[in-house]
Design a protein with these regions (language model features):
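Transmembrane alpha-helix segments characteristic
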Residues: 2-5, 142-146, 292, 359-383
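Membrane-interface alpha helices of multi-pass inner-membrane proteins
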Residues: 29, 143-144, 189-204, 211-215, ...
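Transmembrane-helix signature of polytopic, membrane-embedded enzymes
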Residues: 95-107, 123-150, 169, 183-193
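Aromatic- and kink-enriched transmembrane "portal" helix at the membrane-lumen/periplasm boundary
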Residues: 101-124, 143-173, 177, 198-207
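Hydrophobic, aromatic-rich transmembrane alpha-helices
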Residues: 126-127, 219, 226, 278, ...
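Specific aromatic-rich, kink-prone transmembrane helix
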Residues: 127, 166-184, 189-197, 213-220, ...
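Perimembrane helix-loop-helix junctions
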Residues: 210-291, 346-361
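Membrane-lumen/periplasm interface segments of specific transmembrane helices
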Residues: 213, 218-224, 281-350, 368-380, ...
Length: 491
């Protein structure tokens, strides 16, 4: 049913490129596909000539400067291009059959990338639901709420050529593989995890730091094996055991049985056996080698584009590693993640609850998930452009979709039968509407795109937009160009 619901929403996807980030990520794919290089000058010039790349500073940044390798700079990475390649091929076939110009820029190519991003965003939701079900027994409602109640919705439907929907997918895939691999920590599993981590890092460089969660988890397992010389720990809940009490964080009997079908011993536990430290060291090395090999496309692209095996110096010099804006990136009234996306607060509360009240084998996962959130906050607070002014939401946190789903699923689980459940339900509904309303206000010009103004935003969300909702919905479905006609492109 969820797949059918997503299919029904596909007409809401906007096949359009307008921002500099979208241009950079799209140019990566177009240049590799048609020119077989990472020289983006012709792509940048095309968008500038089409009055698309006309945001403040676009020409000066991308059509005047050169890298050390003598190419026009790009702050994008290759991962989104890799993920978009299959749908871009479909777009090329459509262009050939339908008589569109086969130049890599025409409508079928842009539409392919846009719809591809939407599909990857939806895949992220499916993986997130599966991860939550694996840990707490249910995740469907939490996944739907995170889908609608976070900026992922915007980057799936309104501005899909950004990398954020792909980022949500890559991180969700990485976490899903981790949850499966940690049951046994085999060499094959470590290779899969390393490759998933490489994809995650190639989609967005910042997301590479999320590997710290599984790394800490693995090191903890390695230390435990070294100290005890016995990695056997009983499964937290046998599928033949008693049915969990309402609100318990142990997965239901059916969920446990489903997990048992996925692996020989069930969900998410330290594998029984006689694994040696020597074998685990080999497992760790296999994961590292797999990551290095998987990341090779990005390293080669760095070298060809920047003249060295690393990001542009224009990126690295924007970082202040003391993270002076860590608190602001969360709680600034004008730019904070929690103000843009209050549903995230409830989700993080859920992760804390899982870390404190989860079963012994689930608590380490929750603690590692909280560590992953913390390092994402740290990096986001280290970037000079931490405000991400002009974009919708604290978009760098879209990568945490899977972790937010797990946290929210936990909160919903523990509130079963609790007198506070209706109150929390109302709060969740308000959080979801807040996100939808901000998207509408952002698209219609009813808010300042450079910053939040909470009091004014609240008035628009709860007074103005309900009256305008029918007209906005009609325009979005049947006259979408009316939202951006004659609007100057933004960086």
């Amino acid at each position: 049913m969820l797949v059918v619901a997503f299919a029904i929403t596909l007409p809401a996807v906007t096949p359009r490129i307008y921002a500099s980030d979208e241009i950079q990520y799209f140019s990566y794919l177009r240049s590799l596909w048609f020119d077989r290089d990472v020289s983006f000058e012709n792509e940048y010039q095309y968008f500038f000539d089409q009055n698309i790349g006309r945001g403040e500073g676009f020409y000066a940044t991308f059509l005047e400067h050169y890298t050390e390798a003598g190419r026009r700079p790009s702050f994008a990475t290759i991962g989104s291009a890799i993920l978009w390649a299959p749908v871009y091929l479909a777009g090329d076939l459509v262009a050939r059959m339908a008589g569109y110009e086969r130049d890599g820029f025409s409508y079928p190519y842009v539409a392919a990338v846009a719809y591809g991003s939407a599909c990857y965003g939806f895949a992220a939701i499916l993986l997130s639901i599966a991860a939550a079900r694996r840990l707490v027994g249910d995740g469907m409602l939490a996944g739907i709420l995170v889908w609608i109640g976070t900026p992922l919705l915007f980057y799936m439907y309104v501005s899909p050529p950004y990398s954020h929907a792909c980022s949500a997918f890559a991180v969700a895939l990485f976490v899903t593989v981790w949850l499966r691999v940690r049951e046994s920590w085999t060499i094959g599993g470590a290779i899969a995890l390393g490759l998933a981590g490489a994809l995650m890092a190639m989609v967005r460089e910042q997301d590479a730091i999320l590997a710290v969660g599984p790394i800490v988890d693995f090191v903890g397992y390695l230390i435990k094996s070294h100290v005890t010389r016995d990695s056997s720990v009983s499964i937290y809940q046998s599928s033949r055991g008693p049915t969990p009490a309402r609100g318990s964080l142990a997965p239901s009997r059916s969920a446990a049985a489903a997990g048992a079908a996925d692996s020989p011993t069930g969900i998410n536990h330290w594998q029984s056996g006689t694994a040696t430290v020597h074998r685990l060291v080999l497992v760790g090395l296999a994961g590292c080698v797999a990551f290095a090999l998987g990341f090779l496309p990005q390293l080669l692209a760095y070298k060809a584009l920047n003249g060295h095996y690393g990001p542009s110096s224009m990126v690295t010099r924007k970082m202040t590693w003391t993270s002076p804006h860590a608190l602001e990136v969360l709680a600034s009234p004008a730019h904070g993640f929690f103000i843009w996306t209050p549903l995230a607060v409830l989700a993080l509360v859920g992760l804390v609850v899982l870390a404190r009240r989860g079963t012994p084998v689930v608590r380490p996962v929750a603690l590692c998930a909280l560590l992953m959130v913390a390092v994402q906050i740290y990096v986001s607070g280290s970037v000079e452009s931490w405000t991400v002014a002009g974009a919708f939401g604290q978009r760098r946190f879209v990568a945490l979709t899977v972790l937010l789903t797990i946290g929210l699923a936990t909160l919903l689980k523990v509130l079963q039968g609790n007198a506070l459940r209706p109150v929390v339900g109302i709060v969740i509904a308000l959080c979801v509407w807040w996100n939808v309303a901000l998207i509408a206000a952002f698209g219609t010009g009813l808010m300042n795109r450079q910053k939040l103004e909470p009091r004014q935003n609240a008035y628009v969300a709860f007074v103005t937009l309900p009256r305008m909702a029918p007209d906005i919905a009609y325009r979005y479905l049947f006259s979408r160009e009316s939202f951006y006609r004659n609007r100057r492109a933004e960086p």
